Every structure is written in structure tokens, then in C-alpha cells.
Amino acid sequence: QIKDTELEKCWKMNDIVSIKRFFIVKVNDYNDYENRVRDCFPHLVFHEEAFKFVDELGKCSDVIEELTRHLIILNDVGKKLYDYHNKNEREVLLELSSGYDLVCSGKGSNEEKRFNKEINYKDQRYQLTCNPHTKLYKKRTDKRIYFCWGRDEIEGHNIIIVRIGGHWQE
């Protein structure tokens, strides 16, 4: 169950979005969840393949609240923190960890390459760098949400959710 204090911290949106978020944690199917996310997280952009590996998280009903908590925080404060810290990823990830109890990291110490993904947006192709990710529940887990801090050309530089699932391996 998502704690009320976390909801109060994150739900600064209008009542309609709050109500939609209340009901999205009750779905038992990732397809249903995917069909609802854009209404619940209006400040996030979801890559067309964001949910391609979501089954790697395990049973939907077991992870839905934690997944939703992460998306709420990224939607409600992620971009604001990124702008506040002048695009300093390290500072933003530290604040997300300490202030919002969101386990996250950027490029790992053993990662030689960047994780890149292309996105089509309004008949244009863009290359995204997707190293930052949150980790569901604990620091040492393969359950992750990979994202990009956004691009000016795509919906006002909103965070782009690129991959939800296990550890990204190319």
C-alpha cells in the first residue's frame, strides 16, 4: 500500500489525476496499466517500447504500487529537480534518493557504454541516452525503470520513460 504521506508529497495534481492514480494501482494486468499511464502521468512521455519487458518485473499485482510510486515521483518532481539542479544528474539522483526514498542511479561503474534508444516523435527520429534508472524496492535489484531526462524537441523536455523491466542488456 502506498503510504498517505507519500501520496500527499507527490499528489499535487488536480483531482482527476489523483482519482485516476488511485484506480491505476488496482489493475492486475500490465496491458491495462499501460493503457492508463498517460492519463495518470501527464508530465512523462512513454517510449513506444517502454512496456516491452514489463513482465520481467514479476506479477503485476505484486509490483503495481511500487511501480506507480516511482512514476508519480518522476512525473511530479523529476523535471523540476532536474531544472533546479541545472541538469546535474548526480545531484538530482541524490535528492530523489534522500528526499523521496527512490533508489536510483545513473551510469553504473561497470558500464562502458551508454544505453541509447531511438524515438519517433512528430515524424522525426531522435536518439535518447537512457542511463538513469530507478530501482524498485531496493538497491540491488533487476527491477528497473530506465528513463531519459528529455529533449527540447519532445513535449517541452519532459522525462521520457524508455524501458520498464529487468536489467537492460544489449
Segments predicted by a language model, with ranges:
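Basic, Lys/Arg-enriched alpha-helical interface segments
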Residues: Q1-D142, G150-E170
